[in-house]
From Swiss-Prot:
GO cellular component: Dsl1/NZR complex; endoplasmic reticulum; endoplasmic reticulum membrane; nuclear envelope
Record bears the keyword Transmembrane helix: no
Further facts: Cells with a reduced level of SEC39 show a defect in post-translational processing of PRC1/CPY.
Originating organism: Saccharomyces cerevisiae (strain ATCC 204508 / S288c)
Domain of life where this protein originates: Eukaryota
Transmembrane regions: none
Lineage, top ranks: Eukaryota, Fungi, Dikarya, Ascomycota, Saccharomycotina
Coiled coil residues, start to end: none
Function summary: Required for protein transport between the Golgi and the endoplasmic reticulum. May contribute to tethering of coatomer-coated retrograde transport vesicles to the ER membrane through interaction with and stabilization of the SNARE complex.
Quaternary context: Component of a peripheral membrane protein complex consisting of DSL1, SEC39/DSL3 and TIP20. Bound to a SNARE complex consisting of UFE1, USE1, SEC20 and SEC22 or YKT6 through direct interaction of TIP20 with SEC20. Interacts with TIP20 and DSL1.
Designated name of the protein: Protein transport protein SEC39
Gene designation: SEC39
Localization: Endoplasmic reticulum membrane
A Pfam family matched in the record: Sec39
Keyword Endoplasmic reticulum: yes
Length: 709
């Protein structure tokens, strides 16, 4: 009966976290284990652990203030007198009390999985696990108890559990913002355990670094669970360490040194670690060269490899040894910052085309690194481009092929200063192959230009390429050099005007002018001038400018105009006449028309005939021209006279089948002129009566010429 009452009181005080009263029962339950089990299970999980510090002193028996022993009955009476609410629970009938007693015992035993707690250490471990089930985010909740425990109260096994399980788990939960319970963590398979520890390590930001994860999570976990070899086999491999990022590389390095320290007394595990390092570098070294501080990383890796026995091999490929890896690393440091260990070995065995592809790839990548061109070129001059040495890597590529490849890459990068320096260094002036390469890129830049202005980036590149040709390839270029120079000049001049030469697939024009459009007009260069006159309304008055442009187009496109200069000029002037009429400028059209007839007449009958056959319609339109701005839409008298003059000249050269229509228009004008009152001519341009004799005289002369014709 007393045993049951004391047990129930202990359960009540434990559930109330009543430190003062529970301490009075520490030696009253028959065994210390019962007392510890009650406190372990029933003490509120959320209560401050400091309230349980008294358990560290369980070895000392609780004495009465006077030092006299008290009986169990006295303790029960004292406790009930201090709290009368306990009486119904404790002084109930025997059956009820006994049932409560057994039910509580069964509950506590089940909660502890039938474990018996013999001492403070066992109690503390189970208490930590029980509280962790309710408060899993704080596995170190009871740290105050183990940190303040007296020496030798807690075993090294328990301390190892704290250091190898609780502390790493607490660190991981905080880092990942996850909650793993202690029981869950301890039962987790190794592969999943390793994966969780390294989850997000490569993306970490803030105060926690890679070293913290290794030092505070991984190393204690591996050491406590004796999982070093398992980790090396299952996790420290080429799949996990691609070396594609600086973080992955740093993780690889820091982890290696941690593992090396962990297995230093285990030769088999140490050799396995070294083999895995060689395997990782052999398969993933190509990714190193995308990382920052490459020189430092190569030195770091060389330091690691140099400490390996030469005979260390890769399990999957026994022919690759640590000795070969050291030799490859030496080549890396001196010559290359691109190829992987596997590729270096393969390159030496490949044919010419494959070696050239690798060489070009190497140069392209190195040249594209900021501020690396000059230093890399110097390194190349000292190694694979040193004419005094044999190239031991790219053994099947000639010097010309190497330089051609380098120049092509530099042209793509627009590094013209380096291009010129290489041509001068290796005396490649007027080299046919290099000249053809330069011309190829001239056209590449020219065709990609968005406009023809010299300041346009692609046009500037084309100009710089041409300058190199002018300086170093003039003999090889010959007359082609002048044509390219003129083409750039014409492109620049055309771009200062409104112009649209870009033809779409359906024949319509797009909006933008590109210099390459000029090349589409080789068979019809005059169409370019026509487009200019159409889009630049004032240009029809500037014949010298369009003439210069047209002849420049002929020269740049290598169009032969020998013996055709006069006809080309006449065609251009007639085009100007058309656009003068479009712009309602009869005066300019008339003056140009007179010049055309004079030029053709001086050139001979064949030019006159060609003029009539090809351009009679333009002059006929002059004879029919009406300016809507004229008074009453009537042709001024002076203009009628000039139109009759032009039509009279046209009758001399127009095709026979067109004579009737030209004569008809001339007659219409003559009839209109005869109907004018030349004394009071309100349609005269100057409104003066003395025009009568002048206009009449010209009219009679024209009439006489037509009659004779």
């Amino acid at each position: 009966m007393l045993e049951e009452q004391l047990y129930l009181l202990a359960c009540i005080f434990a559930s109330r976290a009543d430190t003062r009263n529970i301490k009075k029962l520490s030696t009253r339950l028959g065994s210390q284990s019962k007392y510890l089990e009650i406190l372990c299970v029933l003490w509120p999980e959320l209560d401050d652990p400091k309230n349980l510090l008294f358990l560290r002193e369980l070895e000392e028996e609780v004495q009465s203030p006077e030092g006299e022993e008290t009986t169990d009955e006295d303790v029960i009476v004292e406790l009930l007198e201090s709290d009368s609410s306990l009486i119904p629970l404790i002084e109930s009938d025997t059956t009820t009390r006994s049932n409560r007693y057994h039910e509580l015992q069964e509950f506590i035993s089940k909660k502890l999985n039938n474990k018996t707690l013999e001492n403070f250490e066992e109690w503390l471990r189970e208490r930590i696990l029980i509280c962790n089930e309710m408060i899993p985010e704080t596995p170190l909740l009871y740290s105050v108890l183990w940190e303040t425990a007296k020496s030798k109260v807690l075993s090294t096994k328990f301390i190892g559990w704290v250091e190898g399980v609780l502390k790493p788990l607490d660190h991981l939960n905080k880092r990942l913002h996850l909650i793993f319970k202690i029981n869950e963590w301890e039962k987790m398979p190794d592969s999943e355990l390793f994966k969780i520890i390294f989850d997000g390590v490569e993306d970490m930001q803030g105060y926690i670094g890679i070293a913290d994860v290794i030092e505070d999570e991984l190393a204690p976990t591996l050491s406590y669970g004796k999982k070093w070899e398992t980790f090396i086999t299952e996790f420290f491999n080429k799949q996990q360490f691609s070396l594609k990022s600086d973080t992955n590389y740093q993780l690889f390095i820091k982890l290696y040194y941690s593992l090396e320290k962990g297995v230093k007394d285990n030769s088999e595990a140490s050799r396995k670690l070294q083999s895995n390092v060689v395997d990782i570098l052999f398969h993933n070294s190509e990714n190193l060269f995308n990382l920052s501080s490459l020189t430092h990383k190569l030195d770091e890796l060389w330091s690691i490899l140099s400490g390996f026995p030469d005979e260390i091999t890769i399990e999957e490929q026994k022919t690759i040894t640590a000795l070969e890896m050291k030799q490859f690393m030496e080549f890396f440091i001196k010559c290359s910052t691109k190829f992987s260990f596997k590729e270096i070995f393969a390159i030496t065995q490949e044919e010419e085309s494959a070696q050239l592809a690798h060489f070009s790839s190497l140069c392209h990548e190195e040249f594209n690194k900021a501020n690396e061109i000059s230093s890399f070129l110097q390194a190349m001059y000292e190694t694979v481009l040193d004419i005094s040495k044999d190239d031991k890597i790219f053994t099947r590529i000639s010097m010309d092929e190497k330089l051609y490849s380098i120049l092509e890459i530099l042209l793509q990068m627009n590094e013209f200063a380096y291009i010129e320096a290489i041509i001068e260094r290796f005396d490649y002036s007027n080299n046919t192959q290099i000249y053809e390469l330069l011309v190829k890129f001239f056209w590449h830049f020219f065709n990609n230009a968005s406009n023809g202005l010299r300041k346009e980036p692609e046009m500037k590149k084309a100009s710089q390429t041409l300058q190199i040709i002018q300086k170093h390839m003039s003999q090889r270029a010959g007359t082609n050099l002048t044509k390219l120079e003129v083409l750039l000049e014409i492109s620049d001049k055309l771009s200062h005007y409104s112009i649209n030469l870009n033809k779409s697939h359906n024949g319509a024009r797009d909006t933008a002018f590109k210099p390459s459009n000029i090349l589409e007009y080789r068979d019809c260069p005059l169409d370019i001038i026509s487009n200019l006159l159409e889009l630049n309304p004032r240009l029809y008055k500037d014949l010298p400018t369009t003439k210069s442009l047209l002849f420049g187009i002929y020269d740049s496109l290598s169009i032969n105009r020998e013996g055709q200069t006069g006809k080309v000029e006449v065609d251009l002037m007639v085009l100007h006449i058309d656009y003068a009429l479009v712009n309602l400028d009869f005066g300019t059209a008339y003056e140009l028309g007179k010049q055309v007839f004079e030029i053709c007449q001086e050139a001979g009958q064949h030019m006159m005939k060609a003029l009539g056959d090809e351009h009679w319609l333009t002059f006929y339109q002059m004879g029919k021209f009406v300016d809507p701005n004229w008074v009453d839409n009537e042709i001024p008298t002076e203009i009628i006279v000039l139109q009759m003059s032009i039509l009279g000249r046209l009758l001399e050269v127009c095709p026979l089948e067109e004579v009737e229509i030209v004569t008809s228009q001339w007659s219409t004008l003559e009839l209109e002129l005869s109907a004018r009152d030349l004394v009071k001519d309100k349609y005269a341009l100057d409104g003066q009566n003395d025009n009568k004799s002048k206009v009449g005289g010209i009219a009679r002369e024209i009439f006489h010429n037509v009659t004779n014709f």
